Amino acid sequence: TTAWSIGSFTATQTPHQFSAGIEDGPDEHFADMEKFAAKDAHRDNLALRRIFVDNASETLRWLMSFGVEFFGPMPEPPHVKARMHNVLPNSRTYIRLLGGHATKIGVDIKYNFRAERFLVDGNRVTGIEGTGPQGVVKFRARATVLASGDFAASEALKSKYISNAVARVDAMNPTA
């Protein structure tokens, strides 16, 4: 669903913020993030939030090292400072540049493949078995990354993993 997203990325202490004269930091970012959740803030994973805000600036710079360009920072209330960076020209840039780099360094990306079982040797994942256009296939590799879209359009999964109230909210991307 990355290609359907806005492609925005919130971060502090970025070249964009410095150029705009914005003094900001991870602690302020951390404090602002719970404002999005409002009454559900108690459900937030504070350890993951801390990891995100402490690494967002470095991650944005890493993305830029692959040629990803950002516009901003833009205001994004309830954040008190502008820290939303929007990818240019759109979110497909992530797929094009990062996917291209992955292919260049030898990553074998499988599309339209339904992963059904990890192949393991002891406690180590050594591959994946699943169904693709060619039927049932096994892939073995030194590293296995399982990636998928989201479940924003699945009322059943949203109800199971979030809440019944959220399950009734229409998806931004109905085919997700």
Segments the model singles out, each with a brief description of its role:
Residues G132, F139-A176:
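Glycine-rich loop(s) and the adjacent beta-strand/alpha-helix scaffold that form part
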Residues T1, S8, I128, D150-F151:
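Gly/Ser/Thr-rich helix-start
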Residues T1-T2, T144:
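Hydrophobic/aromatic ligand-binding patch that stacks against planar heteroaromatic rings
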Residues A3-D108, N112-R117, A156-A165:
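Conserved N-terminal/central alpha/beta ligand/cofactor-binding core
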Residues R117-K138, T144:
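Conserved beta-strand-loop-beta-strand element in the redox core of flavoprotein oxidoreductases
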